A protein has these predicted regions:
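Functionally critical loop-and-helix segments that line ligand-binding/catalytic clefts
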Residues: 87-149
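Substrate-binding cleft of extracellular glycoside hydrolase catalytic domains
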Residues: 1-48, 58
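Active-site-proximal loop/turn and secondary-structure-junction residues that shape catalytic pockets
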Residues: 5-6, 45-47, 82-86, 124
Length: 149
């Protein structure tokens, strides 16, 4: 998942989406992430109504940035992490192929959105000091395994 300053509406512009996608693609290639797998981009706030306009522009920038990073055709598929409203809007507009539904059930559309590929569960602690979230994935979520691991 690519997450920068995705907790604020003002972060989401076409230009930031473009450059985040270029950086994410470079990082993915650097670690050996195979073409055809997904990079998820986070929208980590309760975006609703007018908030979805800059989010849309950000994901249009992502589409262009991933294509540019690969010489014209994107090597990676686009996923989104966010509320049900964000996931639904971006999937319907075909700006995201995969959705990772946030566990923030009070966020817009989250309790009713059913077309998720990954659904975040409740956070819990492991070893008493490392906090992490559980996640449930459906068949195809754009994942991959690195060769030899």
């Amino acid at each position: 998942m690519w997450e920068s300053h995705s907790q604020h509406r003002d972060y989401f512009t076409y230009g930031r989406g473009y450059w985040d996608a270029v950086a994410a693609a470079q990082q993915a290639k650097g670690v050996g992430q195979p073409a055809g797998s997904a990079i998820y981009f986070a929208v980590d706030f309760d975006a609703r109504g007018a908030d979805l306009v800059p989010v849309d522009q950000y994901f249009r920038g992502i589409t262009a940035g991933l294509a540019a990073a690969s010489g014209g055709k994107a090597d990676y598929k686009v996923g989104v992490y966010g509320s049900g409203a964000v996931c639904d809007t971006l999937k319907r507009s075909r700006l995201a192929e995969y959705t990772w539904l946030s566990n923030s059930t009070a966020w817009a559309g989250s309790s009713s959105f059913a077309d998720w590929n990954i659904r975040q569960g409740r956070p819990f602690a492991s070893l008493g000091f490392i906090n992490h979230d559980s996640n449930e994935a459906r068949d195809d979520y754009g994942g991959f395994r690195l060769a030899g691991l």
